[in-house]
Design a protein with these regions (language model features):
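Bacterial N-terminal signal peptides
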Residues: 7-17
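Positively charged n-region of N-terminal signal peptides that target proteins for export
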Residues: 1-4
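Pepsin/retropepsin-fold aspartyl endopeptidases
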Residues: 21-336
Length: 336
């Protein structure tokens, strides 16, 4: 019964997506179904180019970016100091779109971790200096990243199109099989994700016939390809406008000063074909390790995830994408 209900309501939700990306209804039938399954719904907030969720850490308000590109939950060192949180030397390195956070950085535990109305209980965190993200012109203040460790444990489902986050207690029964069946019946392509050391959640990909992988990064506003990865693909780079350059620098912090753009002819993410389009290219931080021999293509950002109605099941490690011709037409028009 639940399976049939989800198939029906998601098909109805798809019918509503013929509006432009930012004109869609705020509440979807998918949301109603997940609430019935015991999920707590939260609406992400936009500030600058980032998407936040309001939290309380040991009773203190904080704004955290929902970031599937962060393997661990990172909290600003200043906030942790203000909380008086005891920190010890961690055993793992932290690496991601922000670059190396350092070897064996300090870590601690938030005893009362609350995301909106959702009570998560205790959760480990790592300390990192986010002060440069609050520079002039950004229009936002970031207290940290809600990483995949938290999202996986609390069975998170992220609706990238409607900007919703759903959380459920780790001990609650899984809804992933029902969710998968409903989304596939609604026309979505299911793509397996893999957690990779120093990266976050990754998906297999091909660009112009070359195999590699992307990091699925909800913490990045824009999709960026690695200049190092596409060097041998005979793709013509052109200088980006100042608008693209500014957005790219904001996405990756101090690691990029110049961003270019490139037009790909064929790109597959799993079995999902992405229509030809321009994307940003930058000299992204990369490591020789990371648990994979494949080529690191870059980051699938929120722009592409929203455009192709992305749903992320963090518990089952699955990404769902769907092509909508009206939404894609709006994308092409906005890009000129």
């Amino acid at each position: 019964m639940r399976k049939n209900l989800l198939v029906f309501v998601f098909a109805a939700a798809i019918a509503c997506t013929s509006a432009p990306v930012f004109g869609a209804p705020k509440v979807s039938s998918l949301a109603g179904t997940l609430i019935e399954e015991g999920y707590t719904p939260l609406t992400l907030k936009r500030a600058g180019n980032e998407f936040y969720v309001s939290c309380k850490l040991n009773g203190r308000p904080a704004s955290l970016i929902v970031d599937t590109g962060a393997a661990r939950t990172l909290i600003g060192s200043g906030l942790l100091k203000a909380l008086g949180l005891p920190l010890t030397k961690g055993e793992e390195n932290v690496y991601g779109m922000i670059g190396w956070a350092g070897k064996n950085i300090k870590a601690g535990e938030i005893k009362d971790f609350q995301v909106g109305p959702y009570q998560a209980g205790a959760h480990p965190v790592s300390a990192w200096d986010f002060s440069y993200f609050g520079s002039a012109g950004r229009g936002s203040s970031m207290d940290g990243l809600l990483g995949i460790d938290f999202l996986h444990r609390h069975q998170a489902v992220i609706d990238c199109f409607r900007m919703h986050l759903f959380l459920k207690a780790p001990s609650a029964p899984s809804t992933s099989a029902t969710l998968s069946a409903g989304l596939r019946a609604g026309g979505c392509t299911e793509i397996p994700m893999k957690p990779v050391s120093h990266r976050g959640l990754t998906v297999p990909a091909r660009i112009n016939g070359r195999s590699g992988y992307f990091v699925v990064d909800t913490g990045a506003a824009h999709t960026l390809l690695s200049q190092n990865a596409i060097a041998g693909l005979n793709m013509r780079l052109v200088s980006a406008s100042r608008f693209w350059t500014r957005l790219g620098v904001q996405d990756v912090g101090k690691n990029v000063s110049v961003i270019q753009k490139v037009h790909f002819t064929t790109m597959e993410i799993g079995n999902f074909s992405v229509p030809p389009q321009w994307v940003g290219v930058a000299d992204l931080p990369h490591s020789t390790s990371g648990g994979t021999e494949n080529v690191f293509f870059g980051y699938v950002g929120h722009d592409l995830l929203a455009c192709y109605v992305g749903i992320i099941d963090c518990a089952a490690l699955k990404l769902f994408l769907r092509f909508d011709p009206v939404i894609d037409a709006a994308r092409r028009k906005s890009r000129g």
